[in-house]
Amino acid sequence: VIHSMVQFEDGAVKAQLGMPDMRLPIQYAFSYPDRICSSFDRLDFTKCTNLTFEQPDTKRFRNLALAYEAMYRGGNMPCIVNAANEVVVASFLKDGISFLGMSDVIEKTMERVAFVAAPAYDDYVATDAEARRIAAELIS
């Protein structure tokens, strides 16, 4: 139901809620800042009577732990994780890597790509290319 949520420095929280269907968030990503009329099912808040929130299990969901690590470290680390993740997911969808093997490749890519604390645009471009190359190399 919650597709995204952000908490601001003043403590306010904004969330994007919708049916458990990624078509609407993807449509918005492509049409931003405009809104396009769609025929997608609408979220009926009267039927959402019980939303529960739990502490994420980063031991069970290792990629989440890696994403948190990248977020807290900053610099070009989120770019490394994103690039490696895109490579492993594409490989997984073609049966080129196991589900559990994806985390290993992402973590090793994080270790092997040079960290840049304050990246410029060119650093991001180079980081993305290098992370993709290393992740693909680790898979093969």
Which residues does each predicted region cover?
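Catalytic, metal-anchored helix/loop core of enzyme active sites in primary metabolism
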Residues: 1-140
